[in-house]
Amino acid sequence: MRSAQVYRWQIPMDAGVVLRDRRLKTRDGLYVCLREGEREGWGEISPLPGFSQETWEEAQSVLLAWVNNWLAGDCELPQMPSVAFGVSCALAELADTLPQAANYRAAPLCNGDPDDLILKLADMPGEKVAKVKVGLYEAVRDGMVVNLLLEAIPDLHLRLDANRAWTPLKGQQFAKYVNPDYRHRIAFLEEPCKTRDDSRAFARETGIAIAWDESLREPDFAFVAEEGVRAVVIKPTLTGSLDKVREQVQAAHALGLTAVISSSIESSLGLTQLARIAAWLTPDTIPGLDTLDLMQAQQVRRWPGSLLPLVDVDALEQLL
């Protein structure tokens, strides 16, 4: 006997969270809970404003239609990426095919005063990998901050993300302030320039490795080995079903590229599932999941070690 519930939720964000020039005051999304006999599976559907093609309202409409079809015996996945991902996670939990083991190590997202960051990162246990957003300020300032961190902590490796913010000139201004002796400790820089060709040229000219992120979701993208390209950053909420995520990871690994499972600012429930996916598909790579502290609460499932209050399922709005 099948049953299901869909929950709608909204989490207040910390002040200062800006995505593509818009302030994100709340994170809005949906959960689907599928039950069959004694088994249960959960999934999160939370399109990311400014990044997802679909809106939250569109996702809700597609999800509710899919749930009704599933209750009637139809299991075909929807095409909408955020819904396909959430539904496939719920089905995988229901079938016990999403392993429980999780990689809760997250490359910390570095914001704020560089001196404070140096103290925080120096005390980091084990492999020191951190993420810095660049492209929000002047390229020269970004270069100076990155250089300062790499100089102060000799065993630190940085993942940088420019979100296609730079012109070729700004990319060169950034690189000018990063000591060539430190550049090999930039694990990769995600999408430095507005076009892929400009990003490739940046990698060739600076010796700084790049990673594809937004490019993965463009229709003309193909997985090929390229000089200067070291990694792909896979955001499942923006990608689609678990099968599609796994195909992309396998395609990257076949080329010798690092594949990084990364957050689209999901709630704690979604983040714990991403940690499980990372342990399953990319066991040797620290995922990019350090986004929970951008929110003011956890929901349904806790992230280990987080002190944020937990909102129980009973407090969520039911749609069925």
UniProtKB/Swiss-Prot annotation:
CDD domains cross-referenced by the UniProt entry: OSBS
Keywords assigned = Lyase, Magnesium, Menaquinone biosynthesis, Metal-binding
Q: What's the EC number here? A: 4.2.1.113
- Name the source's superkingdom: Bacteria
Q: Which pathway is it part of?
A: Quinol/quinone metabolism; 1,4-dihydroxy-2-naphthoate biosynthesis; 1,4-dihydroxy-2-naphthoate from chorismate: step 4/7; Quinol/quinone metabolism; menaquinone biosynthesis
What are its GO biological-process terms? menaquinone biosynthetic process
Ligand binding (Mg(2+)):
161, 190, 213
Q: Which InterPro entries match?
A: Enolase-like_C_sf (IPR036849), Enolase-like_N (IPR029017), Enolase_C-like (IPR029065), Mandelate_racemase_C (IPR013342), OSB_synthase_MenC1 (IPR010196), OSBS_N (IPR041338)
Function, as annotated:
Converts 2-succinyl-6-hydroxy-2,4-cyclohexadiene-1-carboxylate (SHCHC) to 2-succinylbenzoate (OSB).
- UniProt-recorded name of the protein: o-succinylbenzoate synthase
Source organism per UniProt: Escherichia coli O6:H1 (strain CFT073 / ATCC 700928 / UPEC)
